[in-house]
């Protein structure tokens, strides 16, 4: 599948309906910094995004439309299972490749980017790392082609950042586990065919009593809540999962009982690289939009880009974007080289998400009134960017993670 993904790079370049900026402005990082295979991957994903995602992104947002046809095509390219070994149906690529692909896909459509991120990082990621051979065959391979996608159920109505305070329970009963409780803010909920679900198997042990389970969807005892009407990323569904005596087989536990909190935290560490990359894609397309508009908008007899105040804004936007990209790539490469990357992933996610919000905010300012109307994509980029500072660990949580690692290094 990796070969199929890379082969697409040799096709002709395709232009999207919006900006010449798509191809002209985004050239900073595609030459000597990347191996040839990663450059080919970048071009493949960019071509796909131009042809398949950019033209539908506004409709996806406006109509809360799940991009089913595009997700299926992404599965055929290996984009939904990028670091899954080829023998399990994946692309067999590394996390740097995943970061590059996530950015390009998210540039085309942020909703599609998060759908891709959840399936890769949050659903397949923990099964690959902690699952048995049998679980990988049953719960990974069917989710690589785009026919099925998964979701990740950790947060609850009463806890988000406090992941160890799970009130959802799982009790052993004969040859089954019985789940009760509600999981909240679940991305891909309405389209998912399976979920990694975290529940307490021993409340007395607090976070050491949390376990992870593989749950098919739909299944008796599991009800979906309403689709949330969100500010951004409106093409991905978000809903509660409600468990009422939901019975699953005993072998549905992922890892060992009590390993759930560890599995969740390690999964989020990986996922933050994906969300950082999504934020980079949003930031890049917002910058492209701002530059393209400023180059063509005349004021005082010259393009806006002749004004120093606009030049300074664009310089600050580019600085924030490039800095965040380097942090993201570093985190991905550390993971690929099996080195500690928790602090670096937190830094990447923090820098990229805050850059995306700031850059999309400034893009609206540069466009002025045109930035405030849906005729232009700038307002959508701003709405899409905001969630990247919240999900998979808020900016405040990232700062706690970074500070904790920093202080431990000084005290050791």
UniProtKB/Swiss-Prot annotation:
It catalyses: a short-chain 2,3-saturated fatty acyl-CoA + oxidized [electron-transfer flavoprotein] + H(+) = a short-chain (2E)-enoyl-CoA + reduced [electron-transfer flavoprotein]; butanoyl-CoA + oxidized [electron-transfer flavoprotein] + H(+) = (2E)-butenoyl-CoA + reduced [electron-transfer flavoprotein]; pentanoyl-CoA + oxidized [electron-transfer flavoprotein] + H(+) = (2E)-pentenoyl-CoA + reduced [electron-transfer flavoprotein]; hexanoyl-CoA + oxidized [electron-transfer flavoprotein] + H(+) = (2E)-hexenoyl-CoA + reduced [electron-transfer flavoprotein]. Short-chain specific acyl-CoA dehydrogenase is one of the acyl-CoA dehydrogenases that catalyze the first step of mitochondrial fatty acid beta-oxidation, an aerobic process breaking down fatty acids into acetyl-CoA and allowing the production of energy from fats. The modification Phosphothreonine is found at residue 27. Substrate binds at residues 161, 269-272, 393. Disulfide bonds: none annotated. Its main location: mitochondrion. This is Short-chain specific acyl-CoA dehydrogenase, mitochondrial. SUPFAM superfamilies: Acyl-CoA dehydrogenase C-terminal domain-like, Acyl-CoA dehydrogenase NM domain-like. The modification N6-succinyllysine is found at residues 51, 129, 262, 306. The gene is ACADS.
